[in-house]
Each structure stands twice: as C-alpha cells, then as structure tokens.
Curated annotation (Swiss-Prot):
This is Formate dehydrogenase, nitrate-inducible, major subunit. Mo-bis(molybdopterin guanine dinucleotide) binds at U196. SUPFAM superfamilies: ADC-like, Formate dehydrogenase/DMSO reductase, domains 1-3. It comes from Escherichia coli (strain K12). Belongs to the prokaryotic molybdopterin-containing oxidoreductase family. It holds the Pfam family Molydop_binding.
C-alpha cells in the first residue's frame, strides 16, 4: 500500500462515507489496502537441522513448488522448530540468516576450471571435470602409490594426494568420503576436528573410555554449578546456552566463567575470574589441590569408580618439568614406566586404603601440591580471591546431591597442551563424583553441525569409523593388528567393552568389501592403507612446502582461512599440480591464486596449480543425518533443488570415483585391487541415496543370527538393532558400529520426533537417536552408588530394581548386580575413570603447566629448563617463524562472534550487515600506551604476517599481573577474508603459529605473540 500523509487524513475523515458508498456498489477499482494472505499458506513444510554449530537446532523450511516435472522447489522462509527439545523454536543470529546463506549470491552453480598461470575461471561440464580430475589422480597415483614398504610389508598407501572432509556434510556423505579415500590409499585425510576438537577425543577417551560429550544440551539445566571455561557459550552456542540460563533461573545454579576476556557469557555469570590465555592447567591443577587439601571430594566415588587406588610402577617419576623416560633428542617419551604394578595374574595391584605411597591418589597429591593459590595467581594472573571463590563453589558439588557441569570449546583445545587442559578438568569431575550424573559431566561444545559425526566416522589420518584405528605398517597382518588394539582387562571381572574390537573391525571390513572380504584373505586386511606416521594438516602442508604433494581435495573446507600461518598455506597450495574444491560457496581457498592486494598479494601467472571448483548442495538440498554435540543423530529432509548444476557431495565423489575406476579397468596401474574391491553396490552407483548409506552404517545380518541360547535374533538381510549382535565371523556387516541401532527393522530411529519427557530431566528418549544405543548420559552407572542406589534420587538416571538396571536413561552397563567388582566405565580395561592416564597421553599421565610456544614470559616459573611442551612437534621452517616477546610483546588470541560462523556467514547478507567490518579488541591501558583511539585503523603483526582492522577499545580486556610483569591481550575475531558480501578484510590466521597440541596436532590459535600499532 502506497499512501501519502494527505491521503491518509482524507481516508480517515471519509471513513464512514467511504464504506457506505462502497456498500452501494460504488467501490474503487482497486482498494488502497487489503488483508495480506498468510505467506506460508500454500507452502510445503520441511524439517531440517541448522548447518552451523553443533547445538543442532531444529528448522522448519518452507518452499514453493508443486512437484511437477518441470517445477523447481525453492525455499523462501526458514524458522525455528518449536517442537525441538533443545532449541524450542529459537534460532541464534546465524540461524536467523540461513535463508540468506541458502540464497547467497556467492553460491556456486556450475563446475569451473582455472588453468595453470591463468587469472580467470572458465566454465566446464561435469563430464569434463570428472574426466580431467580422474586422469590427474591416476597419473599421480600410478607414479607414487606404495604397494609394499622397504621391509616388504603390504601397505597400499598413496601419500602424494590428500583430502580435507566437510564437517557440514551428512554422516552419509562422510561414509562415502571414507570409502572413496581409503580405497585409493589416502592417508592425508582430515576434517575440521583436526583444527578444533581433536584434543577432545585425545583426552576424554583415555580418561573415561569414549571421546565425546558425556551428557547433552538440555541436561545442563539439571546442574547446580555451571562452569564455562575454555569457551564462550553465550556467544558461540547461544541457543544451547539457554539451558545454562535455565539452570541458573530455575535450579538456582551458580554460573562461573573463567576467561581472558569479559565475554557475553561472563556478563550473566555469578562469578567471573580472568586468566592469561594458555595457563588453564595451572588454574585447574590449583582446583585439584584445593579439593584434595580440603577433603572436598566424593570419597566413595573416588575409591570405587576411579583408579586412585591402583599402584603405579616404582620407576615412574616426575622431576623439573619432565616425567620419566624422556628422550631429548627424539623429543618423545619411553612410556613404559607410566603404568601399573601388576600381580601374578596380570591385574593391577590395588590399595583401597589409599595409603600406599605408589598409589595413584598419593602420586596425584604430590604432583598438584605445587599449584598453590599464590602460584595460580603468579602464572595465570587470576587474583587469588577470585580463584578461591571458584574453588569453594566447585567444592560444594562434592556432596552427592549436587553437581557441576563443565562447558568448554576451542579455548581449551587450541593450545599445544589442549588435550591436557581437558584432562585436568575431567580429573576434577572424577574427584567431585560428577561423571555419569544428570547435571554433571564433561560437555565438549562442538563447533560444526556434524563435526561429531565426521569424527565418529573416522575421517582423520589414522582413524576408521567407530573410533577404530587404521592399521599401521608395524601391524603386518590381521592378528598383530587385533592384538595391538584389543585390550586385556586390567582388573578382574570388568566389562572391558573394547574386547569386542574384532567384532567391530570384521563387521566394518564386510561392509567395506562385501563378499570379497573372506576369512581366507583376512577379511581384506591387506587392502586397507597402512600408515607409518600421522599425516595431519600441519605435517601435510610441510610436505607440500617441500614439493612432495601433487594433489589436494578440499571438500567443504577453507584451509586458506582455517589453517595457521595463512601466507605459508597459500605458498604451499601454489606448489600443487592440482586442487579440487567441492563447496556450495566461493571460498578463499578456491581463489587463493587471485591477487587481492595486501590481504592476498600473489602473482597468478606464477601459480601453476590447476584448480577445479565443483558446486555442491547445502544442508537444505539433501536428505541425511548429522550428529550434534550431545551425540544425537537427527535426520533432515531436502527442501529445494540445488541452484544451477550443483550436485550433492556423494554424487560428485561417485562421479570422480567411477571415472577413475574405469581408467584402471581399461589401463591397469598401481593399487588396482584395493580400489576395485571397495563395495559400491548402490541402486544408482553414480548417485548413492542417503537411506542406503545410513542402513549400511547401521549394519545388516548377512546370515541368520542366533543368541547363546539358540534364539533367532535377526534373519539374513535384516537390519541390526544393537552392536551386541555384531560378530567376528563374517556374518554381520556394519560401517560404523556405534551407529548400530540408528536404522532398524522398525524404521529410521534418527527421524523420531517424540519430545515427551516424563522424567523432567530432558532426556527425551523418543527424539532422534543418540549413540550408543540411544543412551543420553554416558557412564550413567556411576550415577548410582556401589549398592545401585542413585547418589541423588531427584536426578535418578538408572538404579537397580532387584533384578535389573532400569530408570530414565538407557543403562550404560551390563547385567552385573551391585556388589560385583564390575566398574561403571565399561570401555576401560580397569572399569574406572583414570586420574592417572597411564601411557595414553603424549606429554605425561598427569597434566603439567607448559607455556605456549610463543610465551610472553620467556620462561616457565615452575621449571625454567622446560618452558613449553617438551614433546611438541615443531618443524625447522616453522620454528624460524616463531616470534619472541621482545619484538611481539602482547598475547594474541582468536575467537568467534555470535553473528557469524567462521567464514561462511560473510556470504549471507543479514549476517554481513550485523557485523560488517573486521575489528580487534584491546584494553584501555594498551590503547593509551600505543596512542590508539576507539575506531582507529590498526596493524596487528606477528612473525608470520600482519592484518589491518578497526580498533575497539574496551574494558572487556584488562592487563594481568603475571610473574612480575603486565601481560596485555589482543582479541582477534576470525570471520573476515577477501571473499563474501561483507566488507573485505584480512584473514586472522595470517598471524597464528604452525604448531599443534602434542596429542592431536590441533594448532595453537589461542595463545601467540603479536604487536599492534596505529595504521
């Protein structure tokens, strides 16, 4: 309606007369205003899941299109799903802009090719793309494929081409990617977990048995204390964080935040304590000391459910920053002394009185005794009073009827001690008795919508689906491999569920290779690639730098923006023969060869890399499942057709794969058998359907299956309902054993939508499906005491009813009755949570404070002779690019904003408007010292390069007094680059160092040295 002010008054004055005249039939030809039709009236409603972070918020998408042959469905509205038990209809600013992402002007529509030395793209057909890529791959594979190593062991590996895998893709795409990469012999396979939550698995699995978030989003509401450290949940996971506010508002919970910045999470906290980035282990070890010294532990829990009572070998020691067994030349440990004393039966010796000097309990007490409140204040910069306040509140949850939940994210993982950061906190939860409890646990807040799923599916260099390990070349045959990976119980009468490893592995091989996998050929063991070392991204880009890599696949991954030392990344990509980018959007990686001035100053003519840019679908254009942070597998449905000629990832991979296999069939070559034996028996091999792959992940009975009593449990060809049915005799097949039960003969369990919650605990067992076996809280046997009675009846998860375990969750336990020696941590050989991690961690069985590689102190106050992590892998060329405090005196740390998601949302107009321009944050004191005013343009530099941005001078950052000096922090949001609809900016990772966590090689993005000057 277009009405002037004058017309408006005329209409109002003549309102009665006008309606009367109209009633007599003298109505105007067109009304000035009329009721608008409800815009969703004729729409088709589709349910989906948000593609951004791992809260997994529910979506309702609305599209037009009647399904006619020539009609194209098109989404025109997206909103939150009010039925979803986590999000309850809410979306964060990222989710609110999803429609702009789906319809972004930067969506790719056609396959494109960039020739060597060219400065432009040329459009090509899919056939041209598949044909050329397959020829390049075959030429490289035939030239560099290694069938046997120097010792004559069959290894079937291809090291000169690698692949990055998309954590925004579905689990079904992930499994197709796994089959694609492993059949080719690729070992340089990684996903975003390598640069974000790799330390989560590396720490939680050794401590508890599984490497995943132990509870779930809604369960946070059950906590009495919510501690957010190593993350900023209100900013990065705002809809998930509502459950922390629910705990605060309705359960009288205390919210604690420990962070270098006064964040959005801190703004609603009851207690905020500042900390220097990179010193979390000191803070948390101080908490451990406080709990022990003040006897604020759940003593019965510690005695029965942790390895506190087990005796450690006499030759284990710690002195001056190093544990026993250190080899300074190799920069690694001989870990043989990091183990238990064993009795004549091979079981660990035990002292339940906890008085033996070599029991874990007393060794732990001695180890953390150095971390006094004064030491914490000196190293962390945290005022002693603030630290003690945090300790007191945490200690209150040592009572059986109170719990703390820890929420963490990349603020803990992205350090050279990332895995040990997490382990220290996990040890606190064991002392407090908070593991397995409703409102307790260790909650890893995953960053990408399906990073949990791709980790589950083993898309990492040395992994296989279901947290199985890809064989190494030292495991020359199947027997040696199974012996190396199948643990023996450390204590008598334990579940030791990993003893079923052979069943999981053989079932995987049957799924991979079908009828070709037989007992006579060790189920196709030789066809798997065997590794000699981990080819993580830091390692692989150093190989690129040395000219040892020919090709690289980037599937839904933007390494130019995501990997450390951006200038080195661009230099490395410039040395490739070819690169294939599969993505819905334009990325800096796909255009790394273009000159964008200071932010990417390259000469296209000198870059000889062939680049293929292949347009893929986004979340809204495909069916499939993704796993949120709480391990919930949620099925989503396609809402529209992809733009232009874009195809889904599975179809793209299948196209390349079949062209490559056809070349090998006609021409022969290296490694033919592993490539051709991989099963790809889909109804449409060139376009596998999500439901087919999902059922493959779940698993089938290949013969009639009977239980120990001869009762038929599954007929041949039926889908399995439990991984307990998997066999090691070739009669079952499952691509990912932990997903068994997700799609059964009763249907797709991941599509379940019953949000009823009879217990009030938020477990909603009828919504979606959680691995393992729809269990919502891991280790929930530990929620009850040794007699089977809940520690807190109001938060009962499971209990013993006299004949079996039952309750408000699926029991994470067998049938052992209370009073038996069987421990609650069923994946561990001890059946216990580990305070002492034995030989499972790279730098020690207990956490220890080590400075970041680039330290603002130049020393380590605890042990000056061992400053940084002594087993960190640092390549010579990267070491030359490390800065010193004299030139770069300030701590740099990167982080996210709630309006953006990494570098995706700068392509979405709404998000670009919300946060349009790159900025950095500095304190008022640093601004005054450098003569910088709020809004000034500044240059932030490290030894590796520089960025320019707007300065935001804020009280959210303050200098900390550390070891006799003031330490300032420069806060650096990560969301800008030289592509997108937002204002062009510099890539934050220009500044970050190329060094990683010693266990997972996750880069140290959170603590490095910079300088800042007015531009």
């Amino acid at each position: 309606m277009d009405v002037s002010r004058r017309q408006f008054f005329k209409i109002c004055a003549g309102g009665m007369a006008g309606t009367t005249v109209a009633a007599l039939g003298f109505a105007p030809k067109q009304a000035l205003a009329q009721a608008r039709n409800y815009k969703l009236l004729r729409a088709k409603e589709i349910r989906n899941t948000c593609t951004y972070c791992s809260v997994g918020c529910g979506l309702l998408m609305y599209s037009l299109g009647d399904g006619a042959k020539n009609a194209r469905e098109a989404i025109y509205h997206i909103e939150g799903d009010p039925d979803h038990p986590v999000s309850r209809g809410a979306l964060c600013p990222k989710g609110a802009g999803l429609l702009d992402y789906v319809n972004s002007e930067n969506r790719l529509r056609y396959p494109e090719y960039r020739a060597p030395g060219s400065d432009k793209w040329q459009r090509i057909s899919w056939e041209e793309a598949f044909s050329r890529i397959a020829k390049l791959m075959k030429a490289d594979r035939d030239a560099n494929f290694i069938e046997k190593n120097e010792q004559g062991v069959t290894v079937n590996r291809w090291l000169s081409t690698g692949m990055l895998c998309a954590s925004g893709a579905s689990n079904e795409t992930g499994m197709l990617t796994q089959k694609f990469a492993r059949s080719l012999g690729m070992l340089a396979v990684d996903n975003q977990a390598r640069v974000u939550h790799g330390p989560t698995v590396a720490s939680l699995a050794p401590t508890f048995g599984r490497g995943a978030m132990t509870n779930h989003w809604v369960d946070i509401k059950n906590a009495n204390v919510v501690m957010v450290m190593g993350g900023n949940a209100a900013e990065a996971h705002p809809v998930g964080f509502r459950w922390a506010m629910e705990a605060k508002n309705n359960n009288d919970a205390t919210l604690i935040v420990v962070d270098p910045r006064f964040t959005r999470t801190a703004s609603v906290a009851d207690i905020y304590a500042p900390i220097r980035s990179g010193t979390d282990i000191t803070f948390l070890s101080g908490v451990l000391r406080y709990l022990i010294e003040n006897n604020k532990i759940n003593a019965e829990y510690v005695k029965h459910y942790t390895n506190a009572s087990l005796l450690v070998r006499d030759d284990f020691a710690f002195e001056d920053g190093l544990f026993s067994g250190y080899d300074a030349e190799k920069r690694q440990y001989d870990k043989s002394s990091w183990n238990y004393q064993l009795d004549e039966n091979g079981y660990a010796k035990r002292d339940e009185t906890l008085t033996h000097p070599r029991c874990v309990w007393n060794l732990l007490k001695e180890h953390v005794s150095r971390y006094t409140p004064d030491v914490v204040e000196n190293i962390c910069g945290t005022p002693k009073a603030d630290f003690l306040k945090v300790c007191e509140v945490l200690a209150s949850t040592s009572a059986p009827d109170r719990t703390t939940t820890f929420l963490y994210a990349l603020g803990w993982t992205q350090h050279t001690v990332g895995a040990q950061n997490i382990r220290t906190m996990a040890m606190i939860q064991l002392l407090l008795g908070n593991m397995g409890m409703a409102g307790g646990g260790v909650n890893a807040l995953r960053g990408h919508s399906n990073i949990q799923g791709l980790t589950d599916l083993g898309l990492l260099s040395t992994s296989l689906p279901g947290y199985l390990t890809l064989p190494s070349e030292k495991q020359v045959d199947l027997q040696s491999y199974l012996e190396a990976n199948t643990p023996k119980a450390t204590l008598a009468d334990q579940v030791n569920y990993w003893s079923n490893y052979p069943k999981f592995f053989v079932s995987l091989m049957k799924s991979f290779y079908g009828d070709a996998a037989q007992k006579e050929n060790n189920w196709g063991y030789d066809w798997l690639p065997k590794w000699d070392q981990t080819y993580d991204v830091i390692k692989y880009f150093n190989m690129m730098d040395e000219g040892k890599v020919t090709g690289y696949f980037c599937q839904g991954f933007n390494p130019v923006a995501s990997f450390p030392d951006k200038n080195k990344v661009v230099s490395c990509l410039s040395k490739l023969k070819y690169m294939v980018v599969i993505d819905p959007l334009v990325t800096e990686t796909s255009t790394f060869w273009q000159n964008h001035g200071e932010s990417n100053d390259v000469d296209p003519a000198s870059i000889q890399t062939e680049v293929f840019r292949l347009p893929s679908t986004c979340f809204a254009e495909e069916d499939g499942s993704i796993a949120n942070s709480g391990r919930w597998l949620q099925w989503h449905w396609k809402g529209q057709d992809a733009p232009g000629e874009a195809r889904n990832d599975g179809e793209i991979l299948a196209g390349i794969y079949h062209h490559l296999r056809e070349l090998y069939q006609s021409e022969g070559g290296k490694g033919v058998e592993p490539l051709m034996k991989m099963s790809w028996n889909y109804k449409q091999p060139h376009e596998p359907q999500s439901d087919e792959v999902a059922k493959e992940n779940n698993g089938y009975a290949l013969e009639d299956l009977y239980d120990a009593n001869g009762v038929l449990i599954a007929k041949k060809g039926q889908l399995l309902s439990s991984f307990a049915h998997l066999r090691d005799d070739g009669t079952t097949a499952s691509s990912c054993w932990i997903y068994t039960g997700s799609w059964t003969e009763q249907g797709n369990q991941m599509a379940n939508r019953d949000n009823s919650d009879p217990s009030g605990l938020g477990n909603t067992l009828g919504w979606a499906w959680a691995w393992p076996l729809n269990r919502r809280v891991l280790y929930n046997r530990a929620s009850a005491d040794i007699n089977g009675k809940p520690w807190d009846p109001k938060r009962m998860l499971i209990q013993w009813n006299g004949s079996k375990w039952t309750g408000n969750d699926i029991p994470d336990f067998g049938n052992a009755a209370p009073g038996t020696p069987t421990g609650p941590f069923i994946m561990q050989p001890e059946g216990m949570g580990r305070l002492f991690a034995i030989n499972k961690m790279a730098e020690g069985p207990f956490p220890e404070h080590y400075e970041p590689i680039e330290t603002p102190l130049g020393t380590n106050p605890l042990h000056p002779n061992v400053v940084s992590n002594p087993v960190v892998r640092l390549y010579e060329q990267d070491a030359l690019r490390m800065g010193k405090k004299e030139q770069f005196p300030y701590v740099g740390t990167t982080y996210r904003l709630t309006e953006h998601f990494h570098t995706w949302t700068k392509h979405a107009l709404l998000n670009a408007i919300a946060q349009p321009e790159q900025f950095v944050e500095i304190s008022e004191t640093l601004a005054a010292a450098k003569g910088i005013n709020n809004g000034d343009r500044v240059t932030v530099s490290s030894k590796r390069g520089f960025i320019r941005a707007v300065a935001v001078v804020t009280r959210r950052l303050k200098p900390l007094n550390v070891n006799g000096q003031q330490v300032e922090t420069v806060g650096i949001p990560i969301h800008w680059g030289f592509e997108g609809v937002a204002r062009k900016g510099y890539i934050a990772n220009t500044l970050t160092p190329n060094v990683g966590d010693a266990n997972s090689q996750t880069p140290e993005y959170k603590a490095f040295l910079v300088n800042i000057e007015k531009a």
